[in-house]
């Protein structure tokens, strides 16, 4: 989820030119449609164009507000779907990463940890994976390769152990957007050191899943590849060989742009062959997940078909690690269509996770926190249809 980072991204829209990898077009976009020198505005879909390096083989926009010049339509259906059940279906747990910029912050004031009673409620309903967001700055204060903070690690471990002690999967989500103290992570050795310590701590728990980072964005594409590979290598070298690893892509790891933005990630290698490509998808006009309005009843299906084809063509499997929609009939139909498509293609889609639960979400438009979260009260009965 973009959180306040999204606001910062849109705030740059009034600049004269879009920076490297930033948005430069799309329905409802009001920022600059030109890019800095060496980059060109590339059409990805009707809602999102991005400043990408030249030369490029992708189709580009020509004038501000214009549609792309030679855009081909996405495939209407994927090939050879395989119906079945999901391996994982669950809920994001978001609260330990709250209090952005308040580091280390105070537990109970700036951040908290998930409610085990709420997680138990979800487990009782059949959900079997929980993606636990946390802050790298709190776990490794001041330096990315620093020793872990004992108190924060203990609280994180207690949450993980509660989930896995019930026989369910706990995904460790460094919710940092490829950044550390607001700066893009470029020190691959320090990044690897972080994952060496994290994997060493959890290596004996086979129900732990490692996520390399939440929603890389506006970054050099090769750097995104290198950070993912560094995390994979560090996790395996630390002895965590039985666990799955989730890799994420650039452009907020969006499913709707994956096949044209993150194609190089197909070359990632895991000696244990347990990589899962995690994508996120929201259904509002700009895909940001900040509105209760969905574009149409078909938008969910439309936005994941390209990713389905990419996974199958490259022999990969994926997880929709974040999705949500407003509490209304249009979004409900869009979500149901999207989830049904993923389930019908369960040879390449391992599952999906709603964004988000957590005790501090209050009246947030997608809150899945029992008993009264808006998303929970509106969507729980629907989502239970898809649990493994």
From Swiss-Prot:
Residues 53-91 are annotated as: Linker. It holds the Pfam family Cellulase. The active site is at residues 215, 322. The keyword Manganese does not apply. It comes from the Eukaryota. Belongs to the glycosyl hydrolase 5 (cellulase A) family. This is Endoglucanase 3.
């Amino acid at each position: 989820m973009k959180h306040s980072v999204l606001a910062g991204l849109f705030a740059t829209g009034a600049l004269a030119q879009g920076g490297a990898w930033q948005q430069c077009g799309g329905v409802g976009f009001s920022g600059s449609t030109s890019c800095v020198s060496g980059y060109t505005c590339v059409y990805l879909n009707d809602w999102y164009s991005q400043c990408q390096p030249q030369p490029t083989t992708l189709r580009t926009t020509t004038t501000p507000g214009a549609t792309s010049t030679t855009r081909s339509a996405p495939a209407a259906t994927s090939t050879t779907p395989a119906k079945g059940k999901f391996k994982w279906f669950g809920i994001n747990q978001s609260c330990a990463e709250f209090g952005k910029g308040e580091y280390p912050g105070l537990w109970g004031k700036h951040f908290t940890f998930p409610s085990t009673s709420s997680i138990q409620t979800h487990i009782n309903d059949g959900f079997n994976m929980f993606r636990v967001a946390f802050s790298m700055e709190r776990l490794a204060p001041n330096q990315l390769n620093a020793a872990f903070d004992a108190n924060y690690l203990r609280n994180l471990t207690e949450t993980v152990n509660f989930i896995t002690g019930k026989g369910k999967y706990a995904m460790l989500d460094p919710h940092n957007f490829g950044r550390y103290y607001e700066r893009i992570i470029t020190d691959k050795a320090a990044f690897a050191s972080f994952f060496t310590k994290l994997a060493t701590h959890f290596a004996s728990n086979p129900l732990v899943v490692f996520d390399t980072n939440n929603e890389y964005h506006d970054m050099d594409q090769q750097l995104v590849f290198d950070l993912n590979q560094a995390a994979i290598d560090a996790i395996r070298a630390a002895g965590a060989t039985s666990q799955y690893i989730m890799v994420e892509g650039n452009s907020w790891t969006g499913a709707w742009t994956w096949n044209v933005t993150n194609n190089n990630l197909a070359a990632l290698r895991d000696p244990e062959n347990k990589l899962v490509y995690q994508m996120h998808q929201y259904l509002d006009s700009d895909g940001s997940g900040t509105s209760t309005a969905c574009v149409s009843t078909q938008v969910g299906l439309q936005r994941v078909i390209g990713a389905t084809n990419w996974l199958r063509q490259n022999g990969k499997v994926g997880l929709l690690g974040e999705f949500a929609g407003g509490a209304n009939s249009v979004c409900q139909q869009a979500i149901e269509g999207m989830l049904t498509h993923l389930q019908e293609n369960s040879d390449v889609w391992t599952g999906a996770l709603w964004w988000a639960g957590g005790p501090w979400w209050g009246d947030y438009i997608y809150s899945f926190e029992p008993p009264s979260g808006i998303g929970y009260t509106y969507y729980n009965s629907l989502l239970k249809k898809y649990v493994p």
